[in-house]
Amino acid sequence: MRRLKTFALLAAFTVSATLHASANCPNVPEAQWMHILDMQKKIVNEYGFAIKKFQTDGHCYEIYGWGLSADGKKFEKIEVYFNPVTGEIVKKNVEE
């Protein structure tokens, strides 16, 4: 039983690390990053996302919020990682 718990814990850490590692942002000094307000403006004006929470995650900017679905008919909850230097989307997760 103890072995099973250890295995489950190890698997959870591995999955968590893999999911986090998939947002590959460049490792550059924060002095080269876009200013937070400029990044937020880009997210709203260029991508059309509504921001609920904005934060830094590792070497990425990350938001939780809402965006239009692919067909443009409804809003979806999203989690998006951005390159902090260029503002490009690195990874986008849509809650189903």
Language model features with spans:
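Exposed beta-strand-loop-beta-strand "reactive/processing" segments of non-cytosolic proteins
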Residues: A50-V80, E95
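Alpha-helix termination/capping residues and helix-transition junctions
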Residues: G48, N83-T86
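Classic N-terminal secretory signal peptides
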Residues: M1-S22
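Short, low-complexity, Pro/Ser/Thr/Gly-rich segments in the mature regions of secreted, periplasmic
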Residues: V85-E96
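Short, non-transmembrane alpha-helical segments in secretory-pathway proteins
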Residues: N24-I51
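Sterically constrained small-residue positions within well-ordered secondary structures
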Residues: A12-T14, K42-N45, F54, D71-K73
